[in-house]
Regions:
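Proline-aspartate-enriched helix->loop->beta-strand connector
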Residues: 1, 14, 122-126
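Short, well-ordered beta-to-alpha junction loops that form the rim of enzyme active sites
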Residues: 1, 72-76, 131
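Structural motif corresponding to alpha-helix initiation and N-cap regions
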Residues: 3, 111-112, 148
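Extracytoplasmic substrate-binding proteins
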Residues: 8-76, 170-193
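Short, flexible loop segments at the rims of nucleotide/cofactor-binding pockets, characterized by
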Residues: 48-50, 102-107, 140-141
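Alpha-helical, coiled-coil/dimerization segments enriched in small aliphatic residues
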Residues: 83-111
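Short helices/loops that flank or line small-molecule/ion binding pockets
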Residues: 113-122
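Structured C-terminal subdomain patch of bacterial secreted/periplasmic proteins
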Residues: 124-193
Length: 193
């Protein structure tokens, strides 16, 4: 979205675009944090924060090894699944969860799915981003949408592994150091549950 405005911004001041590459998310995130550390003379702080984050992620990946997951985004009553090659692919690539479906089409808005799909795939963990809660005042929309007899048959539901992620963090603030620390903490709590 900001890409269209970069030239106009350059007329005002120097521009450094910290966009993350969804196909190579974590390395691009590291590059951005390192570059920002250099720009603000905080290279050591950036290095320390990245090192601590890497340790936390390694622990999550160790705990998540062999566990299947499906990350879905709930928008009003619609559900979209995100796979390994998506904007949320780092859940699988970096945090160690095994994608429940390797055939999910990679797209910005995910692949439209229904309750039956979730039951059919039956992941160990159902990771949920509530877009509606992130951009409106409708709290707990995803919980209401997923509170049904079909979802209650899933392994994730029965094992208490439906994880409602920090919607604003995952949908709006996704990509910064603080947001990545929150993501690591959320996923760490989820796998230890």
């Amino acid at each position: 979205r900001q890409e269209k405005m970069i030239d106009k911004f350059k007329e005002i001041a120097p521009v450094f675009n910290v966009e993350n590459d969804y196909n190579n998310y974590y390395p691009s995130f590291q590059q951005n944090v390192t570059a920002l550390g250099q720009i603000f003379g905080k290279e050591n702080v950036a290095k320390e924060k990245l090192s601590a984050l890497e340790s936390k992620i390694d622990q999550v990946a160790k705990d998540a090894k062999g566990k299947t997951a499906l990350l879905v985004l709930v928008n009003e009553s619609k559900i979209s699944a995100f796979g390994d090659g998506s904007r949320y692919g780092m859940v699988y690539q970096k945090f160690g969860f095994k994608p429940i479906d390797d055939s999910i089409k990679s797209s910005t808005h995910g692949q439209s799915v229904g309750f039956e799909y979730i039951l059919e795939k039956n992941p160990d963990f159902l990771l949920v981003v509530d877009r509606t809660a992130a951009i409106t005042e409708k709290a707990n929309n995803a919980q209401k949408v997923l509170d049904n007899d079909i979802i209650k048959q899933t392994k994730a539901y029965k094992d208490g592994h439906i994880v409602y992620l920090d919607a604003a963090n995952w949908y709006l603030a996704f990509g910064g150091l603080e947001s990545m620390e929150i993501i690591a903490q959320e996923l760490d709590r989820a796998v230890k549950k």
